[in-house]
Amino acid sequence: MTLARFVLALMLGALPEVVGFDSVLNDSLHHSHRHSPPPGPHYPYYLPTQQRPPRTRPPPPLPRFPRPPRALPAQRPHALQAGHTPRPHPWGCPAGEPWVSVTDFGAPCLRWAEVPPFLERSPPASWAQLRGQRHNFCRSPDGAGRPWCFYGDARGKVDWGYCDCRHGSVRLRGGKNEFEGTVEVYASGVWGTVCSSHWDDSDASVICHQLQLGGKGIAKQTPFSGLGLIPIYWSNVRCRGDEENILLCEKDIWQGGVCPQKMAAAVTCSFSHGPTFPIIRLAGGSSVHEGRVELYHAGQWGTVCDDQWDDADAEVICRQLGLSGIAKAWHQAYFGEGSGPVMLDEVRCTGNELSIEQCPKSSWGEHNCGHKEDAGVSCTPLTDGVIRLAGGKGSHEGRLEVYYRGQWGTVCDDGWTELNTYVVCRQLGFKYGKQASANHFEESTGPIWLDDVSCSGKETRFLQCSRRQWGRHDCSHREDVSIACYPGGEGHRLSLGFPVRLVDGENKKEGRVEVFINGQWGTICDDGWTDKDAAVICRQLGYKGPARARTMAYFGEGKGPIHVDNVKCTGNERSLADCIKQDIGRHNCRHSEDAGVICDYFGKKASGNSNKESLSSVCGLRLLHRRQKRIIGGKNSLRGGWPWQVSLRLKSSHGDGRLLCGATLLSSCWVLTAAHCFKRYGNSTRSYAVRVGDYHTLVPEEFEEEIGVQQIVIHREYRPDRSDYDIALVRLQGPEEQCARFSSHVLPACLPLWRERPQKTASNCYITGWGDTGRAYSRTLQQAAIPLLPKRFCEERYKRRFTGRMLCAGNLHEHKRVDSCQGDSGGPLMCERPGESWVVYGVTSWGYGCGVKDSPGVYTKVSAFVPWIKSVTKL
């Protein structure tokens, strides 16, 4: 039965029995079972003011909502609204009803700042205006349709739905001012009241919090006789006092009977520290514990300017509102811009005051601010699982501490990842952050609460991450997690930023750029990728030094989606999100175009003079040797890890710098390679160039240099139809000892001793080059560990073709195949003398295919040619 039909039937006296209230509400107030109410006058839905006599004819038509008795003609309902002016808000629910955050079918709304780029279907127009808003209240951004919000459906997709804007809203009616009155609740299109049974100050405080009318509520009662015809919705409301709104309190659906003393619930919203303190409320937050600070002064509400606003000021605001927990200051209209006057400026509390009135500050109304500088606070309750950063210079940095069982404790850094840091900083209201060193902040003395934490990045709360049980760990306080969070824009405002990480670099300051979007890490296409884009990435990660862009999968190809293309940064943005001009996921790229960066880049070439003095007599040093990785069966080498590796390249009519062979730098002016490299194009010096300091063949690099060829010396015994004596020397153009400029990335290799047998002296051997990797020729320098094989095995495999001027190397098992292939011809086989330097024992020469089982690669044995090399080069 609809309400209109019910009222009409009531007026006509046609009801045989009275309908139960829950059948009208359709369980909209979390009441899922249904009743069949007994007949009779003891089960009223409306409480009449007096007994109605029998009617012989219908009365005149009545309005749908009865007016209050004549004794209250000047009194109006009171509810939260900007300045308490009863006008509709163009972006949301009617003024006074800002708390609706569920769809009309009960799905909880997502915060506007957490809506991903990919949606199940297109939402109503103009919603982009709400990007970055932290609340999840229903809104109508175009001002025309019904309010709506985004929600997550059962499949994990994001969809949107309309909201019943006033459902669950409350107001105060019949009081002397807006801070007192009878409590009325809105549901299913009707305002109703609450029976005062068990109504106490905790219940009243929730109403005051919901209406943002003060820090404390005093329970009152109002006779039903003065309310007119109005439904009763609830009885026995049982709030704890810290709920965000009355819908979250335990309560009983009214099922008829007698309400004790026939009294309705009412409240007076007061302030615990007396009338001399200004009235304060928090507005625009997602709960009663946070929001824009607003003061009631001279009959109107106004805001506070954030000049000198800090956590000490927030502490006083939280105390004055009766909100305990962690107090945090927010700046630059973090909770949205207010309206009305700016009441105060230059507030400078010590943190010990009982009220903002006791703090040093400007005079009322004196300021030089606009509403873009409105101050805010959050007062996070101390419940199990609350987190904070302690021991730093502010609430944005310090040891990560978790509150549990009345005590703060730390988190062990075992298995800690960037995603963990992202979840922590996001929960604290920051956009991104990074882990600080363990000794950056003072050690804690409390318990270690958590260990082995692992977050996926999708969590909205830290405790949603997988972890050990409380108190289970194998750590000391030297392993406490420390974090520095960074703002996401002006005033630490959280916006649509994306977590960023660098992958597959040689250290944490470089690598392939990956972004976390829609629950998945993906890469960035290098179309238009410049140093300005790199600067923004490095700034977002907290690095302040020079930044360099890298293209063409310089740090290897990524996996998963390519999230972003055509990034256009000016270099001044705070995060990647500010530079994205193209839809997420839209691109025309492959992973061979993945973008990378190097942060805090201070690379410099050594001068020619300093080289001659300090490095000319040194060979076989790897100045950047920090780690080993395991061409076919190989992996990317360490950049600068093989500084003697050079490449012989074609030029002029034969090709535009195409890679022909690998080679080894023996001195500033001499290079060692294979004789067969000149078999096809001849030995004209004009056809070739040598590139030193190269790592990625398609990306110009700081240490890279291309030098012309002055002389080519092929061993006189070499014959093109044979593989013996496959060795050659190349003289670079330039003055003696000043051809190639030495640096950390350009250094010579050592020659072996004459007739030295590397199988007995060398155990740690590597081949390097840009050759065949099984799919294609590599763009980045490869390296592979390779064992030297006994001479007799090579003689048995290759018969007379294998001579005493050769050696062979490689893994014999197919699943461990390591070999050098076409592109590595002429490149080095390097072995490390124990505790000494790296020696070029072989020059890649020939083999039966690439990585073929039981067919190891064959190398020219350099030790057999040492006298010839020295006679030509004068080394």
From Swiss-Prot:
In which residue ranges is the amino acid composition biased (Pro residues)? Answer: 56-71
Question: According to the UniProt record, where is the region Disordered?
Answer: 29-88
Please provide one cellular component term from the Gene Ontology annotations of this protein.
Answer: dendrite
Location(s), subcellular: Secreted
Question: Under which main EC class is this enzyme filed?
Answer: hydrolase
Disulfide bond sites: C93-C165, C109-C149, C138-C163, C195-C259, C208-C269, C239-C249, C305-C369, C318-C379, C349-C359, C412-C475, C425-C485, C455-C465, C525-C589, C538-C599, C569-C579, C619-C750, C661-C677, C765-C831, C794-C808, C821-C850
Q: Which UniProt keywords apply?
A: Disulfide bond, Glycoprotein, Hydrolase, Kringle, Protease, Repeat, Secreted, Serine protease, Signal
Kringle domain boundaries: 93-165
**Signal peptide interval:** 1-20
Residues in a coiled coil are: none
- List compositional bias (Low complexity) regions by residue number: 43-53
Annotated site location: Reactive bond homolog: R630, I631
What is a biological process (GO) this protein takes part in? proteolysis
The protein's name in its UniProt record: Neurotrypsin
Q: What gene, per UniProt, encodes this protein?
A: PRSS12
